[in-house]
């Protein structure tokens, strides 16, 4: 038996080969008898619904039952008895229901004599429904989905333009909900999402033309958004059942009606209704209740024939158990009588669980007779492996083949490998279809080629086998240094795919193992190599659809390759979606892929951005701790993956461009490749400079032996201890080689480092100041810096030499100028600190130089952070123009925060400044302001390590302190001048607003716990609390001013 190709997805791609399409019904092979039948169906796949079809080969003895069986088998249907095959003439709308026992060859011979083959359409449909069919179909998902698609298609073609607008809107929105089950309920509120639905998918797919033409676009959008919200919480199955519930009152899809007459002559004109609930009934007019004639289990035999009158009407006779005579029905034609007979026969077989037909009819010549002995086709001898179309004439099978495989997909013959040449080794991994092994391929060119072998566990099923081989057929089209190469296939069971072996395994595992040995340039190199592979796929108009670090293989430490093309062609297949829903890479997917199952080069760009993030994070998976169902909500709220530690800002900026919500705003892979190449070159240059810098710093040269052209360290001013001595700072190599250090380049000299005679400062002090010196006025240093790169090491022979006089003079003059400049700046800062003007402070001016707040108790500190020295640190000196900013020493000592820890938050020091010189001994307002500030300080100190459930008690304490304060102010208000009341009330309202903002930020921090935004909202909580404390101080100032005004008014003039 020749191979059967079961997947219907591949038969819709236009072919450039010599393929003769014979319309909707048949495909003709030149010079051969018709052996191929195209059957349309409603098994959903990624193509347009009008093209859902399977190509079937048949022999002379193949019957309709065999055709149906082979189609439903590959979709794992349970209720096979519900299916029937309908033949329609496209020009005249003539319909024939083909009985299961009819031979396919006889059917084709009979009908193709009347009309050309291209005018016929074969269609698989569900015709016979059991009682309570919806409950039964929910246990058979393929049948439920098939029936839904069939009914929806009939509704759109027959009555959609006549139904009420509200019903049309509901049914359309239910189809949107069913089609895009991962889409959130408010997704259509976003303009870009609605535009995808409107322009790319098309509203005509969901709503009738009459509705789209009669309603304005803006109004229609609002109606769709409002209606869609009603069904936002339904899943796919619930959407289907709701669709049937709304449609059933206006369209009876569960029964068929025929206009006919009861009796052998036109005596009683009726409408015969046949269905699971009615059985066999008739109606005399539309308003009447149906009259029951018989149940299906009462029917014993069915006969039909032509009437003997000149009109040649159809006669249908049913022998009913217990009836004295047969029930006779006269139909307008023999075709209608045959269709009625087939319907009743199908219901009888379904109800009785029988396979034998209840129809009795005369045996026509040639019908169901034994086939003649066929002649053996020449190309049959080529066997299964050549994938020829012909089959043995004696085969009584219906074999589904894929149209594209038959005519357009490249044959695997050139890639076929003899199994004897493969030596199977140890298992090195697991794939979607089976294990992956290491092995040896003994080829003529290389007798011991190391290869990877993908095996298939369940390839006895033709559909599984073909899907498994699809990856090989895809991979053979590519030839790129960073795409895994296909070596060959073995198509006989057990089926194997042989590929090149990447010895270092998956990239994700490789990154985790080599986390501490891989430098940044290597990580960027991997991203760049992947971008070249994906730009190559983009140029071939190919979409990968599963770009992730786990699907990238490491061939060498400087070479990665894109692999795993197994999902590339089947990702949108609805059966695969349902069967492997848990395996979909939701956290890597673009929003339009999650919402609408749309996969394009733009969605690949999004996934590549996530893959780059994985690489920079050394194999950490995205959205750790977030459920798949919650990912789309976070993306639509604007959340994106945070910048990895040590990631260049330019690279992270490129990632964020890949994560643009609108697909049209994402860069193409050709652009990404060019930009990654530039970033890679920049990083390599910086790495080389850092290595040169490190090699220089490794040699410890004392000042008295020369070798240092650094300025001597400045002594600390009295009263201000050295930051290094106070913090015990001694630079480690990683601190001395910061990425943003000044890079020495562009100077060519021929001598070693000259030495300065005499030891002015200890050698250790010189070493300690190297970091500052290297970052100090680089443009000036480069003017005279001698070359240190003549031989890669220091020339020690010149250590005893004395610095030339002119260079010594230049250095001393420059140092003197710098010292004078520093002295002037420090004096200016000291004068500023001494002045301390007593001004009313706002939110922008409340912070002091040391980060604290001035309070009502003079310089008394209400809160002192742990570990803060008693002395005041000198003010920060602004960097000189052109000098790179290194940051504080604390930032040098603090480790880079991990992905999960986020930004560390330190509580702010709050010390309200002194206000009016009033007696505070019995000042309730002052006491409550101080209490509120203390509550804010306590919350600030506890918020960082606190779990989310402890946020509410802390904020509640602040709220109670504020309530007490406002009550005290209300008590004091009557005694204050009336002219000041409005200002005090405004200050109170501002405090209430501050508390509301604090509560809002607290809710956001709780909502986004365990995400990258949690630390940001904690910071915003502290900011809101700080604003509350500042405004409480301002309220005290307003009341003090009112008191002073009252005192001045009471004094005698």
Swiss-Prot record:
Please give the residue positions where the record annotates the modification Phosphotyrosine: 397, 407, 576-577, 863, 926
Q: What is this protein called in UniProt?
A: Focal adhesion kinase 1
Which residues take part in binding ATP? 428-434, 454, 500-502
Lineage of the native species?
Answer: Eukaryota, Metazoa, Chordata, Craniata, Vertebrata
Q: Where is this region: Disordered?
A: 1-27, 686-741, 843-892
Sequence ranges of Polar residues compositional bias: 10-19
Q: Which Gene3D superfamilies match?
A: 1.20.80.10, Nucleotidyltransferases domain 2 (1.20.120.330), Phosphatidylinositol 3-kinase Catalytic Subunit, Chain A, domain 1 (3.10.20.90), Phosphorylase Kinase, domain 1 (3.30.200.20), Pleckstrin-homology domain (PH domain)/Phosphotyrosine-binding domain (PTB) (2.30.29.30), Single helix bin (1.20.5.540), Transferase(Phosphotransferase) domain 1 (1.10.510.10)
Description of how the protein assembles with itself and partners = Interacts with ARHGAP26, GRB7, DCC, PIK3R1, PXN and SRC. Interacts with the ARP2/3 complex.
Q: Which residue ranges have biased composition labelled Basic and acidic residues?
A: 686-697
What's the family?
Belongs to the protein kinase superfamily. Tyr protein kinase family. FAK subfamily.
């Amino acid at each position: 038996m020749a191979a059967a190709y079961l997947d219907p997805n591949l038969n819709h791609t236009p072919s450039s080969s010599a393929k003769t399409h014979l319309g909707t019904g048949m495909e003709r092979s030149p010079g051969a008898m018709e052996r191929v039948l195209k059957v349309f169906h409603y098994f959903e796949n990624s193509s347009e619904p009008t093209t859902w079809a399977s190509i079937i080969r048949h022999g002379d003895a193949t019957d309709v039952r065999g055709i149906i069986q082979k189609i439903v088998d590959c979709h794992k249907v349970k209720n096979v008895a519900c299916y029937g095959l309908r033949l329609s003439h496209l020009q005249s709308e003539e319909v024939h229901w083909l009985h299961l026992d009819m031979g396919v060859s006889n059917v084709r011979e009979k009908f193709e004599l009347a009309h050309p083959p291209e005018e016929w359409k074969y269609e698989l449909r569900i015709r016979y429904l059991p009682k309570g069919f919806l409950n039964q179909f929910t246990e058979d998902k393929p049948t439920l989905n098939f029936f839904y698609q069939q009914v929806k298609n009939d509704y759109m073609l027959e009555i959609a333009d006549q139904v009420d607008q509200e019903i049309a809107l509901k049914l359309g929105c239910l189809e949107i909900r069913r089609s895009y089950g991962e889409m959130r309920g408010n997704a259509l509120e976003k303009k870009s999402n609605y535009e995808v639905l409107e322009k790319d998918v098309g509203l005509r797919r969901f709503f009738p033309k009459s509705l789209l033409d009669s309603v304005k676009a803006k109004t229609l959008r609002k109606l769709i958004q409002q209606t869609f919200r009603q069904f936002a919480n339904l899943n796919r199955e619930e959407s289907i059942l709701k669709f049937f519930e709304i449609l059933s009152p206006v369209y009876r899809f569960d029964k068929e009606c025929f206009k006919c007459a009861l009796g052998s002559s036109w005596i009683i004109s009726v409408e015969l209704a046949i269905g699971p609930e009615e059985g066999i009934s008739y109606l005399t007019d539309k308003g009447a209740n149906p009259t029951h004639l018989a149940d299906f289990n009462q029917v014993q035999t069915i006969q039909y024939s032509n009437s003997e009158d000149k009109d040649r009407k159809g006669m249908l006779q049913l022998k009913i158990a217990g009836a004295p005579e047969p029930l006779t029905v006269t139909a307008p034609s023999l075709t209608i009588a045959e269709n009625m007979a087939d319907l009743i026969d199908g219901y009888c077989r379904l109800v009785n669980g029988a396979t034998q037909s209840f129809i009795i009819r005369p045996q026509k010549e040639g019908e169901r007779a034994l086939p003649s002995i066929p002649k053996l086709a020449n190309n049959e001898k080529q066997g299964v492996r050549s994938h020829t179309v012909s089959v043995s004439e004696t085969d009584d099978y219906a074999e589904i083949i894929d149209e594209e495989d038959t005519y357009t997909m490249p044959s695997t013959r050139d890639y076929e490998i003899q199994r004897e040449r493969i030596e199977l080794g140890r298992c090195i991994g697991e794939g979607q279809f089976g294990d992956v092994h290491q092995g040896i391929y003994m080829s003529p060119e290389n007798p011991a080629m190391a290869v990877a072998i993908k095996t298939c566990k369940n390839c006895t099923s033709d559909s599984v086998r073909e899907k498994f081989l699809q990856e090989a057929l895809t991979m053979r089209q590519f030839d790129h240094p960073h795409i895994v190469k296909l070596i060959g296939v073995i198509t006989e069971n057990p089926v194997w795919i042989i590929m090149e072996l990447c010895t270092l395994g998956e990239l994700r595992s490789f990154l985790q193992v080599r986390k501490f040995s891989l430098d940044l340039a290597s990580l960027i190199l991997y991203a760049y190599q992947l971008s070249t592979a994906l730009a190559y796929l983009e140029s071939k108009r190919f979409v990968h659809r599963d770009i992730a670090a786990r699907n990238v293989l490491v061939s060498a430490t400087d070479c990665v390759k894109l692999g795993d093309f197994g999902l590339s062609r089947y990702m949108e297949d609805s059966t695969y979606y349902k069967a492997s829903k848990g395996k979909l890479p939701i956290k890597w997917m673009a929003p339009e892929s999650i919402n609408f199952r749309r996969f394009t080069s733009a969605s690949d760009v999004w996934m590549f951005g996530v893959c780059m993030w994985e690489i920079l994070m050394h194999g950490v998976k995205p959205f750790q701790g977030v459920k798949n169902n919650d990912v789309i909500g976070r993306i639509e709220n604007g959340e994106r993956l945070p910048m990895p530690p040590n990631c260049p800002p330019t690279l992270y900026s490129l990632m964020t461009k890949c994560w643009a919500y609108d697909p049209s705003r994402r860069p193409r892979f050709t652009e990404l490749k060019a930009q990654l190449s530039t970033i890679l070159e920049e990083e390599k240059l910086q790495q080389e400079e850092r290595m040169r810098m490190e090699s220089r710093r490794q040699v410890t040269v004392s000042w008295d032996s020369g070798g240092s052209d650094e300025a001597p360290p400045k002594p600390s001013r009295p009263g201000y201890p050295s930051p290094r001595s106070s913090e015990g700072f001694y630079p480690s190599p990683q601190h001395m080689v910061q990425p943003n250090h000044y890079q020495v380049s562009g100077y060519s000299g021929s001598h070693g480092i000259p030495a300065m005679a005499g030891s002015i400062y200890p050698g250790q002090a010189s070493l300690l100041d190297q970091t500052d010196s290297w970052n100090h006025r680089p443009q000036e240093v480069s003017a005279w810096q001698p070359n240190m790169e003549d031989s890669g090491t220091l020339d020690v022979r010149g250590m005893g030499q004395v610095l030339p006089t002119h260079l010594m003079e230049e250095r001393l003059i420059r140092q003197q100028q710098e010292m004078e400049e520093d002295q002037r700046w420090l004096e200016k800062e000291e004068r500023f600190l001494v002045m301390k003007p007593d001004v009313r402070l706002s939110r922008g001016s409340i912070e002091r130089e040391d980060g604290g707040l001035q309070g009502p108790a003079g310089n008394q500190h209400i809160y002192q952070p742990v570990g803060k020295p008693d002395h005041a640190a000198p003010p920060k000196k602004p960097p000189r123009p052109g000098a790179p900013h290194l940051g504080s020493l604390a930032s040098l000592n603090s480790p880079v925060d991990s992905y999960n820890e986020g930004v560390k938050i330190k509580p702010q020091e709050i010390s309200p400044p002194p206000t009016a010189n009033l007696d505070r001994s019995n000042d309730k307002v002052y006491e409550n302001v101080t209490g509120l500030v203390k509550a804010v300080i306590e919350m600030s100190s506890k918020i960082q390590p606190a779990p989310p459930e402890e946020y509410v008690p802390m904020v509640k304490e602040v709220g109670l302190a504020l309530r007490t304060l406002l009550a005290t102010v209300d008590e004091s208000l009557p005694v204050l001048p009336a002219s000041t009341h409005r200002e005090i009330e405004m200050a109170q309202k501002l405090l209430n607003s501050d508390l509301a903002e604090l509560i809002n930020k607290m809710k956001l921090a709780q909502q986004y716990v365990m995400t990258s935004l949690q630390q940001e909202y904690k910071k915003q909580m502290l900011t809101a609390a700080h604003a509350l404390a500042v405004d409480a101080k301002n309220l005290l100032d307003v009341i003090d001013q009112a008191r002073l005004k009252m005192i001045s008014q009471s004094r005698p003039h």
